Amino acid sequence: MTGRLSSVVSPKVGYWLLVALSAVPAVYLLFAVQYSAITVPFWDHTELIHWIADWREGNFHVSSLWAPHNHTRPLVYRLVMLMNAVATDWDVRSEYIYLYLSIYGTFACFVWLARRLIGEANAVFPVTLLSVSLILFSPVGHNNHWWSMMFQLDATNFFIALSFLLVFTRPEIWSCHVVAAVSCWLAAFTLTNGFFAFVAIIITFQLSATKFTRPDRFAVFWVINLLVASACYLPGMQMESSSTHPSALELLEFSLTYLGAPLGGLLWFPYRSMFQLPMSIAVNLICGSILLVTCAALSLDALPRLRKRHPAAMVLFGFAGFAMLSAVATGWARATFDEYGVANGNASRYTIFGSYLLLGQVYYVGAALVQGWWGEQAHSILARRVVFVLAGFFACAAFVSYGRAWRVYADAHEFNRSLAQTYVWGLDPVPEDRFIHPRPEAVAYLKRQLQLLELGPYGNRAYVKAQSPVGSFSKPVYLSAARTVRQRFVATDDGLKRLSLKFVTPNGKATTGVVRWQLSEVGSQEPLARGDVEAGGARDWATMTLRLPYVVASRGRTYELALSGTGEDSTALGLPLYEPVESSGQPVLLSDDGDAQHGRFVMELTTEYAK
């Protein structure tokens, strides 16, 4: 590639043109995600509402983040997503920040790896960088781009890449092994593939040991980490996903397809829409077979260097081992999972780990060309030209696939628009609910919690306010255990969603306890909503908003708000009462020690209606 460029431009200009070209896939990914991102809760990602609701209601337990899901314990994923949801009222758009950090962080690891193995002051570096960039940001893995839940895979990929970078480029430094082990633990408790990274590192270090039959000290360190992590991970885990497992032939076909998909998809992009799973495995199976053959040939060449723990050889063996373990383990669970069978190996999301087989060979070949490992100068020049021609063909085909892939991101963009429109106020089922989640009861729970807590697509919505008219301020009433304060009002519009009122603190810093509130429709036995207000956290004359479930047909209906407290009047929160004016509604009903009496005052109440 650089040979052809040098006939038109200088080698230095050609070098920097290739480096600049390496940034194109990264920019492409940025625009693709910004355009196609799903920005509302969708499918398995909706399960996060359970943790968010528990957090908001004060029922959250850290141990719940440990619960298994689909053969994994995604502790890191849940922790990051929950903290972000709490901070942003579950604005799904903000989750793509972490997806970007994971993907671009992985690219930074791979760039650093290229610098360590190949160096920068040569023509091979920009060719390697371009190849790595095309593979890492590949639209073949589009499923890991337009859905923020795939942060789980992208973060795992970053932790694994960091671990490999540290231990394979500095194999004799203990501090690197310790940091890499921490990174592998994080990967394992994000997705199960992190355990395959443990195994790949163990095998690579044992193969490179001075005496193969004697346990290597670094391999022992990683074995201990693997055993301890497994002891924490496996108890209580249900590993069976299918009543049947694949035959040896089916497992082989799936694994070869899985390993060949990153290359085959870039040579000719096979996806036509965001959810399409290509049924033909021929191209990817052939690519996977070729990659295994070339990997075997390169491994034979690298074996003497592996014994010396040369970083390029360790990368080749470690990357290939990880990819193969991922392929076989995934195939065991998914090759006969449904009617798609071994075609599941074409799934877009799997290419993120299958690509390590190709990446390991890219790095080793690059290092071999720079180090001149392949014979005399004439043979080395010939090898370099062959590699550059193949790299040029690969880059041209890949950029064509990048262009053809935009239709998938456009499809995701349209799907997101349709999906967002299903989040309308109210809990009545709509046909499009099936796009949110296949189980209607899960959709009903999700919408009920989102509307009640005003999260996600129901956050920052417009509200129409209606304030009850009041006269001059009269006095506060203490909300203690001694009394209950009730007031009835008539809703002026449909879509009742909030009530706002003010509290006062006549007891100052001595204010403690809890104020309990309940809203009911007059004539109904069941309350519409109830909740607590921490009296100690209230500020004098500050407005307090009570969030309600969305009430579709509230216009003209009469409701009653009841407020009660705990403790004595000397520590109670106060509720300001006002002189009534015409049309201000029914007076406050005070219940003192069980004796009900009508007062001649009203509370200042603002009703808000969602539109």
Language-model features: locations:
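Aromatic- and kink-enriched transmembrane "portal" helix at the membrane-lumen/periplasm boundary
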Residues: 125-159
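Beta-sheet-rich sandwich/jelly-roll-like modules and their strand-loop junctions
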Residues: 462-523, 531-558, 562-611
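Hydrophobic alpha-helical membrane-interfacial segments at the cytosolic entry of transmembrane helices
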Residues: 213-234, 317, 389-390
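Intrinsically disordered, polar/acidic, low-complexity terminal segments
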Residues: 5-71, 85-128, 174, 203-205, ...
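Transmembrane alpha-helix segments characteristic
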Residues: 25, 127-135, 222-230, 307-336
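Short hydrophobic/aromatic helix or loop-helix immediately within or flanking a transmembrane segment
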Residues: 64-89, 253-265
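Membrane-interface alpha helices of multi-pass inner-membrane proteins
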Residues: 176-203
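Membrane-interface transmembrane helices that cradle and orient dolichyl/undecaprenyl
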Residues: 160-177
